[in-house]
Amino acid sequence: MRTIKVGSRRSKLAITQTKWVIQKLSELNPSYSFEIKEIVTKGDQILDVTLSKVGGKGLFVKEIEQAMLNHDIDMAVHSMKDMPAALPEGLVIGCIPEREDVRDALISKDHLHLHELPKGAIVGTSSLRRSAQLLQERPDLNIKWIRGNIDTRLEKLKNEEYDAIILAAAGLSRMGWSKEVVSEFLSPETCLPAVGQGALSIECRGDDEELLQLLAQFTNEYTKKTVLAERAFLKQMDGSCQVPIAGYATMNERDEIELTGLVASADGHTIIRETVSGTDPEAIGTACAKQMADKGAKDLIDKVKKDLSSQ
């Protein structure tokens, strides 16, 4: 019987997601056993700086990917939104399970909705994508950076000077928080999600045929098609989770993939948004990126990167 070694970050959410995947794979094929190996990533080590200032891609996956290439682990469970658009040679996304809730969740002290927050309210987030879209909706808000896991952020909301914080609905759901804790689920029209938000990525070596066969049984085709379109868009835009870029795809009534992409200035003053539909995920992502680049999206990303590097 083969023991499959699974790499995971040490956070409660990461371990919970990894255990969920292992349970599902064990149900599909009980002849395998699994062993979790916890790995600390660069993104986990740097908690006193915003992610946008840390820079680079793969802040939460690079060390885990290296362990896979070294054969210390066989596979890894990641949050898809942490995955860079391009993978290291030799590694593949072996499986994309069914997606969780894609929305961002607003949690406020008095259970107020976004439009009900007082003028100048302090909102905590670690994401330029979220802050840019919030500022477009409510330019009067004060954005204050916040890092740490879900429990830490909820504690900071209670004890520090935040009026509200924004978290991914998927993370709250996976950690067993009830929907009652959420003041408002922000619609994709208000706050377009990050590429891959709510989805998991199970990564492994491309030559591990046995494992790839097991993982193929756990892939959700709807999620796979839509997420691949989003990731193709991200790749063409040369984006990362450190810049204000968003992408969300669904299947429309004609059974086509419908992808909306968004790039914003950090202050939310400039937002470029485009929707493209079709049947081929790669082609749709590429087309959406091209249409947005023609409207100045890449120049906007370059400006954000330049501004961040000079701070």
UniProtKB/Swiss-Prot annotation:
Keywords linked to the UniProt accession: Porphyrin biosynthesis, Transferase
GO process terms (BP): protoporphyrinogen IX biosynthetic process
Pathway in which the depicted protein is active: Porphyrin-containing compound metabolism; protoporphyrin-IX biosynthesis; coproporphyrinogen-III from 5-aminolevulinate: step 2/4
Pfam families: Porphobil_deam (PF01379), Porphobil_deamC (PF03900)
Obligatory cofactor(s): dipyrromethane
Protein's name according to its UniProt entry: Porphobilinogen deaminase
UniProt xrefs under SUPFAM superfamilies: Periplasmic binding protein-like II, Porphobilinogen deaminase (hydroxymethylbilane synthase), C-terminal domain
HAMAP family listed in its UniProt record: Porphobil_deam
Subunit field text: Monomer.
Source organism (scientific name): Bacillus pumilus (strain SAFR-032)
Entry annotated with the keyword Transmembrane helix: no
Cofactor binding, per record: Binds 1 dipyrromethane group covalently.
GO cellular component, one term: cytoplasm
EC numbers for this chain: 2.5.1.61
Catalytic activity: 4 porphobilinogen + H2O = hydroxymethylbilane + 4 NH4(+)
Misc note: The porphobilinogen subunits are added to the dipyrromethane group.
Primary role: Tetrapolymerization of the monopyrrole PBG into the hydroxymethylbilane pre-uroporphyrinogen in several discrete steps.
Bilayer-spanning residue ranges: none
Highest taxon of the lineage: Bacteria
Keyword Lipid metabolism appears in the UniProt entry: no
Family according to the record: Belongs to the HMBS family.
Positions of modified residues (S-(dipyrrolylmethanemethyl)cysteine): C241
NCBIfam families membership: hemC
GO molecular function, a single term: hydroxymethylbilane synthase activity
